[in-house]
A protein has these predicted regions:
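Extended, largely alpha-helical regulatory/partner-binding modules appended to the mid-to-C-terminal parts
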Residues: 1-160
Length: 160
């Protein structure tokens, strides 16, 4: 298996041998292995969707960012999983923005995409997004699962 897939399995299993083994079995049972297949099996968000989501935030497009979020949730991805993956994405984006390019487990193509996307944000905006989405993760008792994430989107996009 490619290194990227093994990295995704390790991240999703959070150190649990049993969970990692279950994810590995699911993936190995597939005839074709590509990023979309692996991501859907691991109930995650693919890199391209994270890029689109970040681009909508960079454009301060509240409506499209929330629609993209709700589309992911309709596909069965939990708000918590979206937040966790987006925080990791933002962390990588921040590192690229400040010139740290090593050992993200990303392809050269994805690193290039992050470098281009980093031009749409300044460091303080990336830090603000990290704080907002971290807060959304902490708000576990919301009556509407995606509400803290929607609020994070609106708060960032509606700020001058």
């Amino acid at each position: 298996l490619p290194e990227e897939i093994l990295q995704q399995i390790a991240e999703k299993s959070s150190g649990s041998y049993r969970d990692g083994f279950v994810f590995l079995e699911k993936i190995l049972s597939q005839k074709e292995l590509d990023e979309k297949t692996v991501t859907s099996l691991l109930a995650g968000v693919d890199f391209g969707t994270l890029v689109k989501f970040a681009a909508k935030l960079a454009e301060k497009d509240t409506k499209e960012a929330i629609l993209l979020l709700n589309n992911l949730i309709a596909q069965g991805v939990s708000a918590q999983a979206i937040n966790l993956e987006f925080i990791q994405f933002l962390r990588n984006l921040l590192f690229v923005k400040v010139g740290v390019f090593d050992n993200f487990g990303l392809t050269a193509e994805n690193l290039t995409t992050l470098a281009k996307l980093s031009d749409d944000f300044d460091q303080s905006q990336i830090l603000e997004l990290l704080k907002l989405f971290e807060s959304a993760i902490q708000a576990k008792n919301s009556p509407i699962a995606q509400l803290p994430t929607e609020l994070a989107i609106a708060q960032f996009c509606l700020k001058d």
